[in-house]
Amino acid sequence: MESDPSDDTKRWLLTGDVSIRWQVMRDLLNAPPSQWQPVQAEVGKKGWGARLLKHQDDSGRWTPRLYGKKWISTTYSLVLLRWLGLPPGHPQAVKSCLLFLDEALLDDGGINVTFSYKHSETCVTGMVLALLSWFKINDPRRELLLEFLLNEQMDDGGWNCQRDQGAVHSSFHTTISVLEGLREYVEADGERKQEVRTAESRAREFFLVHHLYRSHRTGEVSNLTFTRFSFPPRWHHDVLRTLDYFRASDAQYDERLEDPIALVLKKRLNDGRWNLQNRHPGKTFFEMEQVGRASRWNTLRALRVLDWWDRVR
């Protein structure tokens, strides 16, 4: 009897880094927490998570500035650790996250890590909200970040880092970073989670109007990089990243998602895997995968998106 290709793909995924294995167990194999949580607990002890933590200094930083030197800065190192699934409450992550509240919190309630202008940076504020929520840092200042983001939501439902400079149309990039922060806040049982769900719904509609990657006026592809799946996505939007958010939020079926789902299916290889299609230029401590080669990260995310899609259709 021939083996099921999907089973072969899952076995291949399980031979990857521990950061992938625990998510495969949770999201694709539907294993109980008693099985995948011990695997997740290893993320900071071996593999990519441990390698990244070794570059952190005693102050909790990866670089002197919180944001400079993409992608080895403290900001993007923490964002990657969240993607890897470093467990909530990890002391090294908690120490680093608090630096943003102690050193980069402005009077407007948001985070500014560049100080090149006086207004807080919406995209980074969304990232930091996600970090504080994922790592279960219940500092009361977290609510200031949330308030800032809710106040920055634009009329079309999304967000744009340049709103204070006159932008009137939301940014795909900023919106997905904020949405991930709001989602982590809800998952962390934040006290304003009902209000946050309403904001999420408005922002999902912004993406749906655009089919996640098209102009709402012409229907043409807004940016070809939106159709090329990267990991880590850094601050960039692409179709797979944002579909994975829709999955994580357990969004309802909407026919406007048929288009981006078809794009994901089109990119599946004959062996049931997905390639790494894009890498955002910048310095890294190490590379996890190679562009043009089969990607466990993209395969994991695509499969769990498709599982969600099959469930809600």
Give the ranges of each region predicted by the language model.
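Preference for long, amphipathic alpha-helical scaffolds in soluble/luminal domains
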Residues: M1-R313
